From Swiss-Prot:
One of its GO terms (molecular function) is aminoacyl-tRNA deacylase activity. The gene is alaS. PROSITE patterns: AA_TRNA_LIGASE_II_ALA. Its cofactor is Zn(2+). It holds the Pfam family tRNA_SAD. Belongs to the class-II aminoacyl-tRNA synthetase family. GO terms for cellular component: cytoplasm. SMART domains: tRNA_SAD (SM00863). It comes from Cenarchaeum symbiosum (strain A). The keyword Nuclease does not apply. Its main location: cytoplasm. This is Alanine--tRNA ligase. Residues 739-758 are annotated as: Disordered. One of its GO terms (biological process) is alanyl-tRNA aminoacylation.
Amino acid sequence: MEKQEILREFSSDPEKYYTVRLFREEGFERRACSVCGRYFWALDGRPACPEDSDDTYSFIGDPPAPRAYDYAQAWRTIEEYFVKNGHESVPRYPVVCRWRDDLYFTIASIVDFQRVMGSSVVFEFPANPLVVPQTCLRFKDLENVGVTGRHFSSFCMIGQHAVPGNGGYWKDECIDLDYGLLVRQLGIPKEEVVFVEDVWAGGGSFGPSLEYYVRGLELGNAVFTEFQGELGNHTTLDRRIIDMGAGLERFAWITTGTPTAYDCCFGPVMGRLAESLGADQDSAELAAYYTRVAVNLGRCGDLNEARRRSAQEAGISDSRMAGAIAPLGEAYMVADHIRTLIFAISDGALPSNVGGGYNLRMMLRRVAGAMERTFPGLDLDELVDLHIDYLMGTYPELDGARQDVKTILDIEASRYGDSKERMGKITAKITDRGRAPGVDELVTLYESDGITPEYLIEAGAIQEVPPEFYSRLDELHAPPPKAAGPGPELAGLADTEMLFYGEDPPEFEARVMHSSDGGVVLDRTSFYARGGGQEPDHGTIGGFRVTDVSKHGGIILHRLDGGSLAEGSTVRCIRDEKRRAGITRNHTSTHILNASARGVLGSWVWQHSAFKEEDHARLDITHHSPLSAAEVKKIEAAANGIVKEDRGVSIGYHPRGEAEQKYGFRIYQGGVVPVSTVRIVTIKGYDDEACGGTHVKSTGEVGLIRITRTKRIQDGVVRLEFVSGDAAIEHERTAAARAEGDRAAEEAKGRLQEERDAGRLKSREIIPGMLEEITGGGSAEGMEVATGPGGRRCLAAGIHDEYFHTSFGKKLVAMDPACAYCAIFEAGPTVRVLAYAGSKSGAGADEIVREVSAVLGGSGGGAAGFAQGGGKDSSKMAEAVARARVLLFGGDNT
C-alpha cells in the first residue's frame, strides 16, 4: 500500500479526513501548493506550502514568539500546558527498546506504548490522554548532524497520545490543543501557523495526519491512526489512536531564532565548545549560512552540494568555511553525539561492533577524532558533566549513571587511540594510490578497521563524506528479521494445558491429541518446553522416552524415542525429577549471577543470552572487556552471598504495563515477552525479572554457585560458564583433587630436582678422578674401556644420568682427542644414547648414535663430534649395548 495512493484518496475528500473544527472556526483556507501541489491549510492566503514559501527558515534571527525558550525551558512550558489540559505527564521510556525485538532503539514516542503480540502490534497506554518527553535515537542521517542546523542523532519527541473515550479525544480536540500550544502558550501569531495534509501507514494500520509548520519549520505531526487493511477494502479500527509527535528541539529553535537548533538545545555545552574555538554563535554570517543550508538541503537533496551552494549564496569563502564554519560544525556534532551516548549508555547500551552498539561506536570515534583535531584542550568528562547537569531537571535519572557513562567513554576513547597507528598505515596506502575509495570501500574500511570517513578527510584520502555512507551502515546493522513460525501440521489443535505453571505434578495422565513422526501433543503436560534458554524436561510418556519438548504458540510438542502413541488414548507420563531439579537450580542461579555481575561491574550489564542444562549453564552478559580473576571472584562471592542468605523466590503475574511501571524495564533481561500478562520472578530485595522458566522456592536451595570459565565471545559480550548445586559441589571436589594432584606432582618434581642436584654434585666430585684414571691408561668403575690402533674407546651403560655423561664425555675427548665415548642410560620412559668422538679418534658419533637408537626403536642425529638420540623400547637395552660394543670395540654382537 503506497503512501501517495492513500494521500490522493484522502485529499480527494478533505471534509471527511482533514477538516477539523479549528479550521472552520478560525477561517483556515485549504490550498494546493503552487510549486509541489500538496494541500495545506493557512490563514494568510499564501500560494505555496511551508517548504516552498519565501519565508522558509526566516525565523533565524527573527523569531515569531515573544519569549525565547531553551531546550529545558521549552519542555517545562509544554508539559505545563498539556497537564493543565487534562494530560498525565509520563517519564520517558529507555532509548534502548527492550520491549521490541525488531528495534534496537526507541525511534518515536508511540513506540513506548507498542507491544508486539504474534504478528500484531497492540497499544498499551499508562494514561489517557498523556504527554511524554521521549528521547529518540535515529542514525540514518549522521552525516547531516552538525551541518544542517536541524539534524540530531538523538532528539526529544514530545508525544501527545490519546484514545477516544474514557477521557481521551479525537481530531478536533487534538488540533485545538496543538494550535493552542503554539498560539496561546508560546504566543506565536496565528497567521504564522500552517497545517499540511499527509498520511501515515505502518504495521497494517494507516490514517490521515496534519503536519504543522511555522515559517517553514515542521514542529509536529498529528497522526490519526484510524484504519486497518488495504485501501479500498479497509475497516475502521476498534481503537483509534492519536499519535502526535513534535520536536522539542524545534520548539526551542522557533522561539529563540538562533542560527541552528544546536545553539539553543545544548545549554552550557555549546558555550564551552564555542569558547574553545573563539567562535561567535550569534553572528549574521552564521545565520545567513544556516538559513540557506536548511533550504538548499530540502531542495537539492545532496548535503555536500547544499553546503557549497549555501556558502556561495552567503558570500563565505572556502578558507572561511574551512577555518570557521567547519570547526563550529564539529562542535555541534560533538555536543550532539555526546548527548546521544549519555542517553544510550545510561539506559544500558554499549558501543561495540555488533547490533545497535555499532552506531554508538561510530559516533564515539567521530567525537574522538573531532576532539583531537579541533578541541585538544577539552576534557570529555567535562562535557559529559555539563550535559548531565543541564539535562537533570528534565531527566533526573541521568545523574545516577554519570560515572558509568564516563567509564565507558574513557575505555572506548582509549581503544580508539590504541588503533590509530594501524589506521594511519592503512590510510597512507590509500592516499599513495591516488584513487579515492567509493562508498562500498569506505564501509569495509570502517567495518574491518574502524576507520571513519572523517579520519580519511583529515588525512587527505577523501574530500567529503558520501551522503549515503551512514544510512548504508545503519541498514547493515538493522535487527534481523523474525524467524518463521511452526508449520501447518499443528494447525487447529487446542492449546496445551501447561501444568508446570500450576501444581506441576511429576507424574500425571494425559490424553493424546496428536501423534505423528514429528511428535506427540497432549491435552495437558508437566514437561517444560525449551524456551528462554532453559532446556526441556525429559522422562517417559506411555513408556517411551521423551527426548525433546518444544513450544509452538500455545501448543507443546513432545518428541519420543522409538515409538508412537494412538491419538485419543490416555497415557501415563513421568518426568525425570533429577534433571528438572538441576535445570531449575541453574535457572535461578542465572538470575542471581546476572544481578551480581551488574552490581560488581556496572549498570551496563544486561543478560545477552543464557543456557541452562541439568549439570551446567552459561550466562552471556553485556560488558566492555574480558573479566579479570578478581572480578570473577567478586561476582561469585556476591552470588553465593545471596544463596547463603536463603532469600525467598516468588512468582507473580501482572498486567504488562503495570509490571513495567512497577519494576522498570530491567525485567526484560531474557528478551521480549509477547504476552499481555507478565510472569515476574522475584528474588526478594535483589532482582525482578520477567521469566517463564522454573525456579526454586528460596535461594538456599541452589546450594552453591561456581563460575568455571569466562571468555569474551564477541565485542561487548562476556560469557560466564557455571555450575550450581550438586554439580558445583562435584566441581569443587574435582578441583580439590586436581589441586592435590598438582601439589603431589610439584612435590615429586621437587624431589626429582633434589635427586638431580645431588647427582650433579656427586658427578662434579667423581668426574675428575675418573678422567685421570682413564686418560692415564686405567679403567673406571662401571665403564668398559679398551685401547686399540684408533685410540681409546669407552662405553658406559646403565649408570649415571645425562648431566654426568654430557659433562664427562665432553671433557674426555677434550683431554684425549683420540678417544671416543658412548653412554646408554634410562631417562624416564625412554632410553637415551649419547656419543662423543675426538678429532683424532677416527670414529663418528652420529653413526654410533643412529645405529644404537635404531635398535631401541628410535632415531638420533648430530655431527661426527657429538650426537644424541634414543628410543622407547627399553626391553632392547641389552641389544643396544651389544651393538655399541661392536661399533666401539669391533667384533660381533655377542
